[in-house]
Amino acid sequence: MIFIVLIAAFVAADQLTKYIVVRNIEFGDKISVIDNFFYLTHWRNTGAAWGIMQNGRYILVPVTVVLSILIVYFIFKNSNKFYRFSLSMILGGALGNLIDRVFRTDGVVDFLDFQFGNYHFPVFNVADTFVVVGTLLLAYYTLFIYKEDKK
């Protein structure tokens, strides 16, 4: 049950931040948070993370739905809380972006914008962060905890 609440919290955090951006920053505008490093930039992405598969909405929506169902299955199949938390984070992020893909025809709202010297990292959002951090936690689980669970 706690994992359903966590997933809902991850989705809510993502959607709330996107709502704040859409209501307060004009599309394409950039607000400096830390000069030459971190900006809030209202952008839309019609593809997947980091701009791959542009205009791939009709592929990304059904793939996300199928993968989300699989993730729910694995959350309830495994009893390890670390594993379940990792998958909950991934699912919360996936559902946050799925909501945008279904209800925003102009793309997923992105706004976290980082620059490192001459390198400009692709603009992303809180949902993307949840997916990446959840995936890193899942990798950690697979490499270091899974073996202990099997003993």
From Swiss-Prot:
Keyword Methyltransferase attached: no
Superkingdom of the source species: Bacteria
Keywords noted in UniProt: Aspartyl protease, Cell membrane, Hydrolase, Membrane, Protease, Transmembrane, Transmembrane helix
Enzyme class: hydrolase
Subcellular location: Cell membrane
Pathway: Protein modification; lipoprotein biosynthesis (signal peptide cleavage)
GO molecular function: aspartic-type endopeptidase activity
Record field: transmembrane: 56-76, 82-104, 126-146
One GO BP: proteolysis
Active site: D110, D128
Major localization listed first in the record, in broad terms: membrane
Catalytic activity: Release of signal peptides from bacterial membrane prolipoproteins. Hydrolyzes -Xaa-Yaa-Zaa-|-(S,diacylglyceryl)Cys-, in which Xaa is hydrophobic (preferably Leu), and Yaa (Ala or Ser) and Zaa (Gly or Ala) have small, neutral side chains
InterPro entries in the record: Peptidase_A8
EC number: 3.4.23.36
GO cellular component: plasma membrane
Membrane-topology descriptor: Multi-pass membrane protein
HAMAP family xrefs: LspA
Role: This protein specifically catalyzes the removal of signal peptides from prolipoproteins.
Official protein name in the record: Lipoprotein signal peptidase
